Amino acid sequence: MTIPHVEAGRATLALPGFVNAHCHAFQRALRGRSGGGDFWAWRELMLAEAQRQTPDSVRTEYPAVYRELLAAGYTVVGEFHYLGLDEALAAVDAAAEAGIEIVVLLAAYARGGLDRFRQSSVAEYLAQTDELQGRGIRVGVAPHSVRACPADWLEQIAAYAVGHSLPLHVHADEQPREIEECLREYGLRPIELLERTGCLTERTTVVHATHANGDELDLLARAGARICACPTTEANLGDGFLPVERVCTRGIGICIGSDSNVRIDPLEELRELDGIARRQSGRRNVLTTDTLLCYGADEGAGALGIERWDEVEVDLSHRSLRGVDNVFEGLIAGCSSEVFV
């Protein structure tokens, strides 16, 4: 895995491919729309873009997004999908066309958002999940959030995930308003509600957790759950910072995702995480290079329930590695995804 070889006069180094554990491919169309306001203002733009999507548009537009992921060093994508079942099947076709492995994280939506997001019942949602599995498609269950799924939905989806040994992914603690609404409805914070409804297990990945408090992090640690950090998107949307140092001291696994695809570069996601940890702690090397590379690959694979995935090759002659003694540290410290071939 780490032995350089020379092909066509170019020395390369093979690494496990990076795993994109959280992606909304359709949101790539919003890149460059900076605008003003906050997350909730951006969400209105996102909803309008979602409304435009059809199976045909997914088959037409997603392959380019997935090829961009591949070019950046991702070889697996977890597509957190809430556009509808036909569009999910189209996303699988798009991934096959691009040549990237896909795990469909089919989102459950009971309330909020757009009508097209919603299933009429948990039974309908689970039937859709069954249909995807029946077609041989890798899947995970994904109650969108505690905003979108009430407690009884969370309980039933959690039981299904356990019964079928499936990954469970869910957005939580991304925005203060989400936490305030959850406290008003249940008297619990989002991750506390996930724990109460059986959603926290070793197969669970909580996406963002930028505003998780210490008690919530303790719950994740006890359950063996992971956090998916998406720092380029979180920066773009003003979501805040993952409390990286407090997460690490509890031994909680971290994986990464391109999320809204405002920027597609796993090395940048990892470098952002490293920078956040340094700023929060006032120290350097809070996260080792080995740890960061594990976040980029192995932890993502664990989050998606996969054991084997494709490698990616580093161009050792790339200008960004000139004069670098340790290739792995150089990748994290100073390279972009342009270094991959």
Where are these regions (language model features)?
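Histidine-centered catalytic micro-motifs
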Residues: 16-28, 167-176
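Alpha-helical scaffold segments that flank or form the walls of functional sites
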Residues: 31-101, 123-134
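Short acidic/histidine-rich active-site segments
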Residues: 168-175, 237-240, 245-269, 306-314
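Active-site gating loops and adjacent loop-to-helix segments of metal-dependent hydrolytic enzymes
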Residues: 29-61, 109-123, 176-201, 223-226, ...
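Histidine-rich, glycine-flanked metal-binding segment
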Residues: 1-15
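C-terminal cap of metal-dependent C-N hydrolases
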Residues: 311-341
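Metal-coordinating catalytic core of metallo-dependent amide/deamination hydrolases
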Residues: 88-209
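Glycine-enriched alpha-helix->loop->beta-strand junction motifs that scaffold or abut catalytic
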Residues: 99-101, 160-167, 199-202, 219-228, ...
